[in-house]
From Swiss-Prot:
This is ATP-dependent protease subunit HslV. It catalyses: ATP-dependent cleavage of peptide bonds with broad specificity. Keywords: Allosteric enzyme, Cytoplasm, Hydrolase, Metal-binding, Protease, Sodium, Threonine protease. Pfam families: Proteasome. One of its GO terms (biological process) is proteolysis involved in protein catabolic process. Its main location: cytoplasm. It comes from Actinobacillus pleuropneumoniae serotype 5b (strain L20).
Length: 173
C-alpha cells in the first residue's frame, strides 16, 4: 500500500509518493522509491500496488515511451491495450500515474487510461486522503507551488494512512 499524488498548478506538474513497503501487516522497508523520472527526464511516474508488478509495468511503460518518442497519451493507451490482451499482464496488481509538463494520466489496474477533470490525481491506500488535502489547498488562496501542495498532501495522508510513511520523494516537470 502507498500514497501517490499528482498536482498541476501554474504550468507545473508534481508527483510525490511515500517510501513504505509492507508485507501483510508488517513494514518491510521505509525507503522505497515509488516516483521516478524516465524518457530523458521529461516524464515522471508514480506507482502503487504490488512492488514487483509495479516494476514490470514501469519497464513496459518506459519501452512504450521510447517506441512512441515520449508521447504520453499514446504510450499509456498502447500499454493499456497490451495490459488487457496479454494474459500474463492481466494478473498484475498495480496502477500508476504518469505525467509530463502538460498532461497527466492514471493507468488503472484494469488497463483503463483516465485523464482527470481536476488538477489532482491520487492512488494507493492513502490516495483519497492526499487527494482531498491537495484539492483543499488548490481551492484556497495561497502561494503554494504544485510541489509544495504535493508535500503537504503526502504529510496529511501519512498521518492518517497506516500503510504510508513520511519518507517522501517528489519530482516536478
Amino acid at each position: 500500500m502507498t500514497t501517490i499524488v499528482c498536482v498541476r498548478k501554474d504550468g507545473k506538474v508534481a508527483i510525490g509518493g511515500d517510501g513504505q513497503a509492507t508485507l501483510g501487516n508488517c513494514v518491510e522497508k521505509g525507503t522505497v522509491r515509488k516516483v521516478r523520472r524516465m524518457y530523458k527526464d521529461k516524464v515522471v511516474t508514480g506507482f502503487a500496488g504490488s512492488t514487483a508488478d509495479a516494476f514490470i509495468l514501469r519497464d513496459l511503460f518506459e519501452k512504450k515511451l521510447e517506441l512512441h518518442q515520449g508521447h504520453l497519451i499514446k504510450s499509456a493507451v498502447e500499454l493499456a491495450k497490451e495490459w488487457r490482451t496479454e494474459r500474463s499482464l492481466r494478473k498484475l496488481e498495480a496502477m500508476m500515474i504518469v505525467a509530463n509538463e502538460s498532461e497527466f494520466l492514471l493507468v488503472s489496474g484494469s488497463g483503463d487510461v483516465i485523464e482527470p477533470e481536476q488538477d489532482v490525481l491520487a492512488i494507493g491506500s492513502g490516495g483519497n486522503y492526499a487527494k482531498a488535502a491537495a484539492l483543499a489547498l488548490l481551492r484556497t488562496e495561497n502561494n503554494l507551488s504544485a510541489k509544495e501542495i504535493v508535500a503537504e498532501a503526502l504529510k496529511i495522508a501519512g498521518d492518517i494512512d497506516i500503510y504510508s510513511n513520511h519518507n517522501h520523494v517528489i519530482e516536478e516537470v
